[in-house]
Swiss-Prot record:
Ligand binding ([4Fe-4S] cluster): C603, C606, C611
Recorded catalytic activity of this chain's protein: 5-amino-1-(5-phospho-beta-D-ribosyl)imidazole + S-adenosyl-L-methionine = 4-amino-2-methyl-5-(phosphooxymethyl)pyrimidine + CO + 5'-deoxyadenosine + formate + L-methionine + 3 H(+)
Broadest EC class assigned to this enzyme: lyase
Required co-factors: [4Fe-4S] cluster
Source organism of the structure: Psychrobacter arcticus (strain DSM 17307 / VKM B-2377 / 273-4)
Gene name, Swiss-Prot/TrEMBL: thiC
Pathway: Cofactor biosynthesis; thiamine diphosphate biosynthesis
The name this protein goes by in its record: Phosphomethylpyrimidine synthase
Enzyme Commission number: 4.1.99.17
Length: 691
């Protein structure tokens, strides 16, 4: 089945149980049961997480509707009080990247794409024009190619471009507006989104963080967003030809973001699968998507992704340019690359990774490395430089690239083509020489009001990570840093989502603005749906840990809410407040599957007799009883019935405590240990058992 078949199957009006079936997803016959479950789940584009609903916060105008996920919480049980009088817990609001796929009031049709959220904002500024058609040679040729007609996205709008001003190229970047004091709807949207209704939360307590020079106000305002973009400390990646995208911001004074890589290769994957990966990734919290396709139909794949993506899409244009010269790096030219930039900008790519810092003089510095040049883009440009013995056209034509990007508001992601591929190669002169060049290029881009972020490593031991962050801030004048990990050890293939998340949490704390996720398949193979989810959840943990360490305003509120639910044995709320409710619930139900256990005052770790939190609650009740007794003695006569009631309450609680922490508990502990010893010998004295 081809992508053209999706339309009849995916066009549906959403309901709470609706599913938009993109049945063109390919599922290998040999897949495991777990893989099959994840593939099936990924087809259901509309499934929202438990106890959640999509809500919108309106801005200063009716068309600024900022999406959030509202999590409904159960009331707090109060012993001896009717359920109708239990303490009510307000709903909790979290940042939501899933787009309208989880909106029950939206019709999803993948063949038509998402609603054009930003279209009117772009038009009303009056500084863009709609072209008569595609202006890139390759785009025009592709449109005439009948062999790809069945793969083509059917509803392609004519692209927009900045109007010329006084005979010069126009500029429509968010940085251009910000530097002129203009607060755009995108900036207001972001301010609401970043604040996450935190002022309405009940428990905003948190520890003071270590910011390493970052400065974030208690409430994010549109003016603060504007000032950060104007200074170059943050970027808003929003191409005018991707009006479907929901505005977001990348900068160290905002929430740490994560990026998910997808893309086909010559070895496999289809357009259908890439669209499915994108919707799956954004459902679990990917803030950005990079399409790293290198296989067939790169142009068509990208069109489908952009038209259906609620988050910014980034690419590495040199990959497609290389395909146009049949993979021969030496045959690349500025003209081919320029045409590729225009082609992708007119499709709506929000940011380009461009390895303009790979200079001829840096290439020999990699000769003594253990793993040489590991960046695909870096190796392509290094080979070109050596073949022609001159600086790459990415470097010599950098200002020409800026002229293109400011007409569409495409942001730079200046690539680290000489990043280290192992711990041994970290922080060498090749890596840091390129970083200093990226700092110089940042100033050139800012001269054109083009937004910039800087890519970073890689593989770096923990004790050497901060040196990377400090040098980046110094040489790149606080431009946002965007890193792959870094991996903190090289000995754990299959677990590199963990080795890299350790480094990601650290460098995020030190000031990195966006973390590129790593899946368990890193260095081993192409990730499936489960790998994508595992990578995203792992990196959401790292990003959140960094926000906590920085003391980002409101960052700890979700931790407080979940901890309160845990202490009060509100099991469903614990699951629903988690980053991955499905897995939390699944693990709990493996040992305590009954519905009654969802309200039990214990878990399978300690059991009903030895739950530390239940004992603590009893201690609190005991203390409260003592206070009630003391207060009653001080306020009523000895003959009062209230005094008898208070004494009865304290005796009851006292008895409960003795049962749990006194001699009875000790006897039960010894009896339980004896029973488990007997069971251990009876079952063959095996440390581990097959399950």
């Amino acid at each position: 089945m081809t992508i053209s078949d999706i339309g009849s199957q995916a066009s549906t009006t959403t309901s709470s149980k609706a599913t938009a079936k993109a049945d063109a997803l390919k599922t290998p016959a040999h897949r495991s049961e777990t893989d099959a479950r994840f593939e099936e789940d990924a087809r259901d584009l509309h499934r929202i997480l438990p106890a959640s609903r999509k809500v919108y916060i309106e801005g200063s105008r009716p068309d600024i509707q900022v999406p959030m996920r509202e999590i409904t919480l159960d009331p707090t049980p109060i012993q001896g009080v009717p359920e109708s009088e239990w303490e009510q817990n307000p709903p909790f609001y979290v940042y939501d990247t899933s787009g309208v796929y989880t909106d029950p009031n939206t019709t999803i049709d993948l063949t038509k794409g998402l609603p054009k959220l930003r279209e009117e904002w772009i038009k009303e500024r009056g500084d863009t024009e709609q072209l008569s058609g595609l202006s890139s040679d390759y785009g025009q040729a592709r449109a005439r190619d009948i062999s790809t007609a069945n793969l083509r996205f059917a509803h392609i709008d004519k692209p927009r471009r900045a109007k010329a001003v006084d005979g010069k190229v126009g500029n429509v970047t968010q940085m251009h507006y910000a530097r002129r004091g203009i607060i755009t709807p995108e900036m207001e949207y972001i301010a609401i989104r970043e604040t996450q209704k935190q002022h309405e939360l009940t428990d905003m307590r948190q520890h003071e963080g270590e910011t390493f020079g970052a400065h974030t106000p208690a409430i994010i305002t549109p003016e603060f967003v504007r000032s950060e973009v104007a200074a170059g400390r943050a970027i808003i990646p929003n191409n005018i030809n991707h009006p479907e995208s929901e505005p977001m911001i990348i900068g160290r004074n905002f929430l740490v973001k994560i990026n998910a890589n997808i893309g086909n290769s010559a070895l496999g994957s289809s357009i259908d699968e890439e669209v499915s990966k994108m919707t799956w990734a954004t459902r679990w919290g990917a803030d950005n998507i990079m399409d790293l396709s290198t296989g067939n139909h790169i142009h068509e794949t990208r069109e489908w992704l952009i038209r259906n993506s609620p988050v910014p899409i980034g690419t590495v244009p040199i990959y497609q340019a290389l395909e146009k010269v049949d993979g021969v790096a030496e045959d690349l030219t500025w003209e081919i690359f320029r045409d590729t930039l225009i082609e992708q900008a007119e499709q709506g790519v929000d940011y380009f990774t461009i390895h303009a810092g790979v200079l001829l003089r840096y290439v020999p510095l990699t000769a003594n490395r253990l793993t040489g040049i590991v960046s695909r883009g870096g190796s392509i440009m290094a080979q070109w430089c050596l073949a022609h013995h001159k600086e790459s056209f990415l470097y010599t034509h950098f200002e020409d690239i800026c002229e293109i990007m400011k007409q569409y508001d495409v942001a730079f992601s200046l690539g680290d083509g000489l990043r280290p591929g192992c711990l041994q190669d970290a922080n060498d002169e090749a890596q840091f020489g390129e970083l200093r060049t990226l700092g110089e290029l940042t100033q050139v881009a800012w001269k054109h009001d083009v937004q910039v972020m800087i890519e970073g490593p890689g593989h770096v031991a923990m004790n050497r990570i901060k040196e990377n962050m400090d040098l980046q801030l110094e040489t790149c004048a606080d431009a946002p840093f965007y890193t792959l990990g870094p991996l903190t050890t090289d000995i754990a293939p299959g677990y590199d989502h963990i080795t890299s998340a350790i480094g990601a949490a650290m460098i995020g704390w030190f000031g990195t603005a966006m973390l590129c996720y790593v899946t368990p398949k890193e260095h081993l193979g192409l990730p499936n749906k489960k790998d994508v989810k595992d990578g995203i959840i792992t990196y959401k943990i790292a990003a959140h840990a960094a926000d906590l360490a920085k003391g980002h305003p409101g960052a700890q509120a979700r931790d407080n809410a979940l901890s309160k639910a845990r202490f009060e044995f509100r099991w469903d709320d614990q699951f629903n407040l988690a980053l991955d409710p499905d897995t939390a619930r699944e693990f709990h139900d493996e040992t305590l599957p009954k519905d009654a256990h969802k309200s039990a005052h214990f878990c399978s770790m300690c059991g009903p007799k030895f739950c530390s939190m239940k004992i603590t609650q009893n201690v609190r009740d005991y203390a409260a009883g003592l206070k009630t007794l003391a207060d009653t003695k001080n306020s009523v006569s000895p003959q009062s019935g209230a005094l008898n009631d208070a004494e009865h309450l304290i005796k009851k609680v006292d008895t409960q405590l003795v049962e749990q922490v006194g001699s009875a508990s000790a006897e039960e502990i010894h009896q339980g240990m004896a029973e488990m010893t007997e069971k251990y010998h009876k079952e063959g004295r095996q440390l581990y058992k097959e399950v």
